[in-house]
A protein has these predicted regions:
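Intrinsically disordered, low-complexity regulatory regions
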Residues: 1-112
Length: 112
């Protein structure tokens, strides 16, 4: 019988820590690209919502869908065809959209 590969809690914590660092770094790098000089970190979703006649949550969900579909496709494809950098990028982008959604929801609750 083949020996199972396991990940310990300590190893998982390291994975989580590294992923959070990637997320924070990417969000910081992309800030200027998506907000320009605007102080509102969520302005891109508000503008997209206004253009589409919907709430910022829905605009963000539409943008996030592309990343989730890409990640889903990778999960169902031959795993060997994707290198670690590609996995890192897709996972990080997907998580970052969820973090941004959290901020949109928080702002909406504060306004309401």
């Amino acid at each position: 019988m083949k020996e199972e590969c396991i990940i310990t809690q300590a190893e998982f914590n390291l994975v989580l820590e590294k992923q959070m660092e990637r997320c924070a770094s990417t969000l910081q790098k992309k800030k200027k690209e998506y907000t320009g000089d605007n102080q509102d970190r969520l302005i891109a979703f508000k503008v997209a919502a206004a253009m589409q006649g919907c709430k910022p949550e829905r605009a963000l969900a539409g943008m996030m869908a592309k990343h989730i579909v890409s990640l889903y496709d990778m999960c169902y494809a031959d795993r060997e065809t994707f290198d670690r950098a590609t996995w890192d990028e897709k996972i990080t982008d997907s998580l970052n959209y969820l973090f941004l959604l959290r901020a949109v929801v928080e702002e909406g609750q504060a306004d309401g």
